[in-house]
Structure formats: structure tokens, C-alpha cells
Amino acid sequence: MEKTQAQSLLEKLTGNLKDSVTLNVAGVDFTFIRDNAAYDQMLNDIESNNKVTPIKDYLLAIVAREQKEALLEIIHVPTLAAQLAAKVNEVFVPEIQITVKN
């Protein structure tokens, strides 16, 4: 069966995405598992006066189960959650080129 244009595009956009990434924080490794629903939930929960809590919740939802308690102990260090999420999303979120055609 021949692929549709949408199927080919989906493959192109998501074909190189990894299912997990390990980040090292001051000598301690944390593994995060890609979860598109958790990412969507984070975006839905972010508000102009509430950005950090949804990011922390996202990281706690996607960290490897056996590392959740360790992450919970350090997640409140200022800027840590934002920095971790940025690194995680470099791997999990595709960079998509979109142009406007008039």
C-alpha cells in the first residue's frame, strides 16, 4: 500500500525522535521517557502567571520511575526545571520548518 502525503510527512517529522534521553545533573544521571500527552498537558497548563509548576509536573511525569524521588528532591532548585525541560525537549520535540505562502 502506498503511503499518503500525510503519512510521509509524519515519518519525516518524527522519524529521528528518540524515545528516551539521559541528562547528567552535577554527576547524577536522570533518564526521561518521551510522552507526547505529558508534553501537551504541560503546554495546556502553562499560563502567564504559572509557568514553572507545569514544567516541573511534566518532568516528574516523564522521568524514569526509579528516579522520580531523586528528581523530586532537587526539582525546586531555581531554574533547574526550565533548564532540564529545555534539554529534554531538544531531543523529544521536532524542529519543524513552517513557511507562509501568500
UniProtKB/Swiss-Prot annotation:
Q: Which domain of life is it from?
A: Viruses
Q: Which InterPro entries match?
A: TAC-10
Q: This protein is called what?
A: Uncharacterized 11.3 kDa protein in lys 3'region
